């Protein structure tokens, strides 16, 4: 595969970013409790989770040293779960983050997002929010396993879309059930004055592992990419594909930039048990330390080598792939503790003739 000059330059940029590893985005997995029981949950969360919430004081104490290493407001804390709104102290946590020089936002399913909590979060300095809406009513309620979840998410969308100066997007997990209604979902979002829409596929992890209803066939993946490319060309709403995979000829057509898995390079996380990792949905074998025994900044500066030098990913179907120099082993959440083969490859499914080795999934 011959690279374009822009792709070549971007590959150099990606290597340089891995060497610099400046932290810009920090997930706080504040709870594993959730008010839904979604069929595709990568963290296997539930309302009766026995895992304790991570105390905010412990989290704040761990990240305060970042103030000396980074400029004020240069790091965004993305609060996730579980469902962050299960924590009654969420507005207070957000306010203290802002007072200590951190931007913050949250990822929510919208089920508990009421006008009252919306006002409290804005007053606490919330600057960004990601809201899940997984299709039209029937499809969304099926995936979320709750007959009221769509109505609650739409209420949240209306509140969020009406807020001035709030950065937000709506995310949709595309699956075999909702792939045929993307056009209708887009029209729905435009009618509700949504400005940004990000689409994901569902990875074979957590509850989605082994569930064929969650995955897309190659022809459906192509349909998804063509839809996004056309929607971006039309320009009626800002539509992007997620950062989950290298896409070959669809690069820059469905995203603003080339594929770059920034886990452990610019993205870190503190999980509910205090573990220090990258994106919360990657395998726990990638954990680099724990705030209860390690200094977070020291861990960030001196560990994470497995994420910053990914030559170990050149195995399995990646070993002979002619797109490897652009992909660098794909997204880390698609590698398990064995690390002997990527679990799924969208590029291979979109371009089966470009793969020099037969598929072999773990």
Residue ranges and their predicted role:
Residues 2-128:
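Conserved alpha-helical substructure of the radical SAM core
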Residues 8-13, 17-22, 281-362:
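Flexible mid-to-C-terminal extensions adjoining Fe-S/redox cofactors in radical SAM and related proteins
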Residues 27, 31, 35, 258, ...:
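Residues immediately within or flanking Cys/His clusters that coordinate Zn2+
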Residues 33, 37, 41-44, 264, ...:
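Cys/His-rich metal-chelating microdomains
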Residues 34, 274, 296:
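Conserved, mostly hydrophobic/aromatic
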Residues 49-50, 103, 123-124, 128, ...:
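Radical SAM enzyme [4Fe-4S]-AdoMet core and its adjacent flexible, acidic
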